[in-house]
Amino acid sequence: MTEYENGKKRKVRNKQQVKVQFLSQRYLILCFCCFFVLLFFLSSDRISTLSVRSDSLRPSLRVPTLSVLSSSMDSFHRGRFPPLSVEDRVQFPDHLLLILSHGIGKGEKNLVCVYRGVKEETLVLPSISSDEFDEFRSIVRCPNAPLNYSSSVDLQFRGDLVKKKMKKQSRRVHNWEKVGYEAVIDGDTVVVFVKGLTRRPHKESDPSYYKCQFEIENSEEKEVTQAIAAAQEVVRCGLPESLKLNPEMMFRVSVIHIDPRGRTTPALPSVARIYGSDSIEKKEKKSGVKHELCVCTMLWNQAPFLREWIMYHSWLGVERWFIYDNNSDDGIQEEIELLSSENYNVSRHVWPWIKTQEAGFSHCAVRAKEECNWVGFFDVDEFYYFPTHRSQGLPSKNALKSLVSNYTSWDLVGEIRTDCHSYGPSGLTSVPSQGVTVGYTCRQANPERHKSIIRPELLTSSLLNEVHHFQLKEGVGHMSLVESVAVVNHYKYQVWDTFKAKFYRRVATYVVDWQENQNQGSKDRAPGLGTEAIEPPDWKRRFCEVWDTGLKDLVMSNFADQVTGYLPWQRQQQE
């Protein structure tokens, strides 16, 4: 064989070796790509056999397969969040509330609830929702435990391997009917909100029957102080010295009840926490200039109506907004963030406690006291209107702020009450595109009930309220406005698709839910409706006795664009 032929064969062999090496590299790259694609599908919940879909509430047994991939997902989640640690669980009638000892943010969709049966079998269901709770904690809502499964629910990320035995941590489940649920520092006292102490509505209780217990987290140390005031679901006690001296500490606060015979019962279970740093922050706020007029409200799924309400009342002079969100799932956080970006001073406070409107208002009165001279308590479907300003050609802008400012120096006036006019559907069958103030123009003839704007520092220490008004300190009274000066337009009976949501649950503590066959003559109910959300044939014509376009005319003349006619809250149409 010639040297030329030998050289040619060597070149062919070299080419084959290079080709084999190239194919091996391509094969390895292809394998890695397949691995990461599979990992993506697992994390995106694309393979139903490995995870549970978030839009399904059907039980699904968890099969612990592909442990290598699960370990990878574990590492991924550990990089994003600290280990999930369930601090407390509260059993509500229609869901379980899990309180986490750290933050995970609102709307985390990759969380699943893990249930364990009597034989240690596991069941995985998607979480209902998640949210921020306070500065340090988060909450997750889970479906109620199915039959034969424990309510001591655990929490994991979707795609993680279900552990047969969880790390040792609190397994307690609190009954919503008997638990301390919130606490807030007010000066040298703490206000504790608790279910299960008394069912006496609208009356103060003897504080000598109550004490507050303060327990330092992760410690056996406990301190007890005597109650100063008590009413409904509120107990106020003095702060212990240890909290004043340790502002960096966190305390669990619970309430002890002493019966009339002097026997002390164990402290009620509690998920309420306070932080020593809260008292320092409040002292710093107290030194600043207060807003003249603020508003507190509690709502559920009112995001579509919030913009009109805030823009209009801001024009009347409201400077600060406290929104207590009672389990909304309609994008309320995004709406508030948008309003804040437009320089409206709005904050959202997560309030997961059902049927506690009175307590929520008391809580807000304490929070707002350091920032506001006056605080209004009214709903998103209620709008202040000044008929005299309209009829006499007086400017209505800042009218509400000017009104309360006239009484700021009056130490004997702690509350300003305004009567309400209830409006009906006004012949409409769909939500008015220009908002409630323009769309609903027919009302009942006679006013019913009232709404209040209060001076927080002139309330009784018990913070007793009946939603529509608060109890004031001895010697302090209220001012009732005549209708010609101011009224509240209450768009109470809207088109049926909006109105029927009221059947879901009433927010006030002592108001019976409409599905229950009780107190059907109550003013809280709609006359002529039973216990089911069935639309009457003549609904659009009901509650219409007087056509009143006063507020509509005011809004159109002051808010409508002169060229397009659009109102500023018609954002979607303008886009």
Swiss-Prot record:
GO molecular function: glycosyltransferase activity
Protein's UniProt keywords contain Nucleotidyltransferase: no
Protein EC: 2.4.1.-
Subcellular location: Membrane
Keywords: Glycosyltransferase, Membrane, Transferase, Transmembrane, Transmembrane helix
Enzyme class: transferase
Homology family: Belongs to the glycosyltransferase 92 family.
Main subcellular localisation: membrane
Protein's name in the database: Glycosyltransferase family 92 protein At1g27200
Domain GT92: 293-540
